[in-house]
Amino acid sequence: MSERFVRIYEIVMKYEGGYVNHPNDPGGETYKGISRRAHPNWEGWRLIDQKKPVSEDLVRRFYYDQFWLPLRCEEMPAPVGEYLFDFAVNTGIRQAVKTIQMAAGVAADGILGPITMGAIRRSDVQVLMYKFLAHRIDFYVTITTQRRRQFEVFFLGWIRRTIEVFSLLMSQK
């Protein structure tokens, strides 16, 4: 695992709790942000069901294999790949890719192909990061206003995380 991944993983884990089963979360049961509904075959669920500890290595490996690598974060300039990873952990890969596509000015189809990667690589990193920040906030505003009763409990936490991670990543450039 790369240094870039390890650094952003540690940041993201500050925002992802241990075991959570919030009734308003469409992801249902989660462990350190891993949704049982989205990832029912993750081996950590077996350990949790048996009341056994889940190693940090198992969680880290999951995020590396299921998020960092498919998102091709290492191929993106820092801190764009890191910010994309953070958003994907919270919203899922498809939504995160659509959002970075909007920020990069390409069709938002949720597919991370050569057009999207080219647009990301050609972008001014600082400008792209500010656009990505704005699109992330807009996403949270939109889903919260559409399903207020379900999501308003999460809204301020989402916005806080979005801004804090952005600020931290931009200060490390």
Regions found by a protein language model. Give the residues of each.
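Cell-wall polysaccharide-cleaving catalytic domain and substrate-binding groove, primarily
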Residues: 1-173
